[in-house]
Amino acid sequence: MHLHVILLFSVNLLYLLQPTITVNAPTNETDRLALIKFKESITHDPHMMLSSWNDSMHFCNWFGITFTCGRRHQRVTALDLQGYKLRRSISPHISNLTFLRIIYLQNNSFYGKIPHDVDHLFRLEEVYLNNNTLEGEVPSILSNCSNARIINFNWNELNGKIPAELGSLKKLKLLRLGVYNLTGRIPPSFGNLSSIRVLSLAINKLVGNIPYRIGHLKSLVYFSISSNKISGTIPSSLYNKSSLQIISVSVNQLNDTLPANIGLSLPNLKVLLFGSNDFSGPIPISLCNASQLQILDLSEKKFSGLVPTNLGNLPDLHWLDLSNNYLGRSLDFLKSLTNCIKLDKLDLSTNQFGGVLPIPVGNLSTQLTELYFEANEISGTIPITLGNLVNLIGLGMDDNLFTGLIPTIFEKFQKIQVLHLNGNRLLGELPTFIGNLTQLFLLDLDEIGRAHV
């Protein structure tokens, strides 16, 4: 719950390189007039980025414009105006730039609908319209842009169903249609996107099942459908997709058990986000074979049994969330986690862990910033070795059976902001050193007083 993530990872840096295109000095009146109309449609240009778009210079030298010069054509091939807070609807005259291959209009304030004449841009390869306030439906006529390799419409206000026609884009490598109000099902035709590497449909209102053929996409590296209403099970074909590095299906209505061999069939896995679904069963021991795993979220489910003691074999693990399950009672796996020297966040809250907190807990990574044990049945005194975790920002140990005094070693927590120890059997008065924790803004100690610092 504390570490719940809906990861929308910035894979653009991993999988996409913006091209460098040679600028020449051609002339083409059709393109010039289209650019003039585009400028006229802009009502807000706070950085004056379009001030060069005038007759004082040849339009091939206008800011954000790239030309190519060939034997037959001297045409605009790229429009790059990303991140300048430009405002207005996107001019339909952009469709007259028929040699456009690249459109970078992300991170602006464009609104209205995506021009329906975009299919005239049949040479289009990359289009970034993410981080605007565009509305309406995703144009099905985008399927006519058969050379499209990248379509990124994330973070807009689009609605309606995802066009099944997009499944015909055989060259498409990245498709991001996340953070909208898109409805309906994931089109089965997406199983035909034979070149797709990144498929992100997160944070919508999609329903139905995951199409089985998604698991047959041989190049798929990143798959995200988090925060929808997808139900059913995850296709076995997806579990066997060895190219996958990131799987994010958290906050849906999926139900299943994890395959025993998941760590063997997904050896390149780096991120596994399964939180807030209806999965059950044991946590597979084979996960330790996914040696590149960095983030593992199995929270808010019905996982049961013991936590594998070999998770310490994951050298790059820095985020582990096992909260809100039926795991327990042994905490022996904590000793193994001391090998995870990059561990930054650990959430074991709301399970059935019992017994005393092992002394090796103080040998967890010194990079640890968040540690949560609350709502378990852990007893005994708080080990003084916890004081070794000097970079803690959040520590939750509430609603357990801890006894004794608050260790004075907690004085070392000079970065601590949130400290929950309520609902235990702690004794004594509020330690005076608490006043020296200058970053602390929430201290909860109901057994010996409640204070907000």
What does each model-found stretch correspond to?
Residues M1-H452:
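Plant-biased, solvent-exposed loop and capping regions
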